[in-house]
Amino acid sequence: GPPADPAALIISGAPATTGINDGVNAIDDRVYFGAMLAAGAAEFIDGAGVHPYGWANPPDARAADPTQVSSSHNNHPSFFFADTLADYRALLVNAGADSVPLWPTEFGWGTFAGLLTDEGQPATPPAGSEFMADNDEWEQAVYTLRAFELGQEWDWVGPMFLWNLNFTRALGPEFQEVGYSLLRFDDSRRPAYRALEHRDE
């Protein structure tokens, strides 16, 4: 039947970046997104969801860059904000769907710098999230602002959703999600929050 709200926008779900395509543990997100487009998904969406996380890499960095900042998660395009967006854009163009904008529905940079445990000790990234030790709170702020600048420069990028505001209210330091939060455990504002608060539109 007809849609309940013809003005509602339909945004495709964003595949998680994997960098793995072994057919058992994961399907590479680029392969999956390409298959979505090959199946005709572009005909039914107003925007394509994408999760261009930068891990600990600056938003302008690329996997092909020989000088890496991050000590890990730096050997595949899926670890780079700009590479992920460029790869998804290329897939849209190749599918003849270049009019479909990319919507970064989740992105950000995590760091445990400035986060304290209940005992007042510096929190450290949990196992598997050691890359967050490569960024401090100021880099989190600078990278976030630059990512928004890039999104505005690229006319094929739609609305961008930064993740997350305050998982620190729900989770403890044993969870990697709190590293992305713009608020600390005591609700004080991290530099990224303040930078966005005072950013020119």
Per-region residue spans from a language model:
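Noncatalytic carbohydrate-binding groove/subsite architecture in carbohydrate-active enzymes
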Residues: 1-134
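Aromatic-rich peripheral "rim/lid" segments of glycoside hydrolase catalytic domains that contact
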Residues: 118-201
